[in-house]
């Protein structure tokens, strides 16, 4: 059956992918790095949250879990995540092998591993912390999400789902606490260690589903009787996101990378990402109506995979062309907008020729 779409969720995805691209446009050592890194890692949090909210969600029913056959899940993961990962990974490795040395000499002299062979092995291993994914680091998200969906799939099919659900929501806190105390950082295939860290966000998305069901009209920009109450909740969530950023700034956090092993203050990691992600969901309701801006944001939200796998190329090209630019949020925002527009243009062309590169079927080549 066709997957049900809600305007608010598409808008949230559109805002989140813009924040991710904005974070990649920024200089990691620039004056606004905390704000930009915060936008990137909360943007990633939104995708894990919404992945949980829409997991096995189909038209006509809104089940807690619909007992989807594993074969169906495996086919979906292959088509929508694994195949695009290997296609764009191979393209990225080839381009990096040809142009990587030049780009690194201008932007990152400390980068190495330009040979195609080792990078292909790095693609098979699929961990951005290995040093062999410099060709397109954002692709780590695809294989990490494969682990997350598989873990939750088997967890939700268990007869002891409540106890296992509790374990999945608490295990990452124990995992990261031990990791920070021992200073032992694992680098597992397909970002398994990161997948364990983000289990609570996927689980929180499962809890969000019931809210989406009861407030479906709001997610689609419709006026309903409890509008005042819902607006109050959304304002509270947006305020919580602002407080999360303020908390980071007050504590002097310098590195807000999504991967918890590179986040300098663990006490900020979980609450800031969760509050920031819910804040983005709150703001996205402003774009769930039928106005032109809302339509554009939702159009982008329906094509986030294309932007994720391709934005590395225009971002690096603009960084090379503007390598002597003055660092500012406005400059980074301009680079982000140009990168997103270029990705959408290429997506429109490639989707007509070979929609499989973006995990789509031919009959639904317009949306993910």
Roles of regions detected by a PLM:
Residues 2-368:
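Alpha-helical transmembrane segments and their immediate juxtamembrane cytosolic regions
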């Amino acid at each position: 059956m066709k997957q049900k779409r809600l305007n608010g969720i598409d808008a949230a995805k559109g805002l989140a992918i813009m924040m991710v691209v904005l974070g990649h446009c920024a200089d990691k050592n620039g004056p606004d790095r905390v704000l930009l890194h915060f936008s990137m890692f909360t943007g990633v949090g939104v995708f894990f949250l919404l992945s949980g909210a829409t997991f096995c969600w189909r038209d006509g029913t809104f089940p807690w879990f619909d007992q989807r056959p594993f074969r169906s899940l495996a086919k979906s993961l292959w088509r929508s995540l694994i195949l695009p990962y290997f296609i764009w990974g191979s393209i990225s490795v080839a381009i990096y092998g040809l142009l990587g040395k030049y780009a690194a000499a201008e932007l990152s002299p400390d980068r190495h591993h330009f040979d195609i062979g080792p990078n292909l092995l790095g693609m098979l291993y699929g961990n951005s912390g290995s040093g062999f994914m410099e060709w397109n680091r954002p692709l780590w998200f695809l294989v990490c999400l494969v682990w997350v969906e598989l873990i939750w799939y088997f967890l939700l099919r268990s007869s002891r789902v409540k106890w296992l659900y509790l374990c999945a929501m608490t295990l990452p806190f124990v995992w990261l606490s031990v990791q920070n105390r021992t200073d032992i950082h694992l680098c597992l295939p397909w970002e398994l260690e990161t997948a364990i860290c983000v289990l609570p966000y996927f689980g929180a998305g499962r809890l969000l589903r019931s809210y989406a069901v009861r407030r479906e009209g709001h997610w689609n920009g419709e006026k309903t009787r409890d509008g005042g109450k819902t607006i109050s909740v959304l304002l509270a969530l947006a305020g919580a996101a602002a407080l999360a950023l303020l908390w980071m700034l007050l504590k002097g956090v310098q590195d807000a990378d999504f991967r918890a092993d590179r986040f300098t203050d663990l006490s900020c990691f979980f609450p800031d990402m969760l509050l920031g992600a819910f804040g983005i969901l709150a703001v996205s309701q402003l774009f769930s109506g039928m106005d032109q801006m809302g339509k554009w944001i939702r159009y982008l939200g329906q094509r986030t995979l294309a932007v994720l796998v391709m934005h590395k190329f225009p971002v690096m090209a603009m960084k090379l062309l503007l390598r002597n630019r003055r660092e500012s949020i406005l400059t980074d925002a301009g680079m982000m907008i140009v990168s997103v527009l270029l990705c959408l243009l290429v997506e429109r062309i490639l989707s007509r020729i070979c929609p499989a590169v973006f995990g789509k079927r031919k009959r639904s080549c317009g949306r993910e």
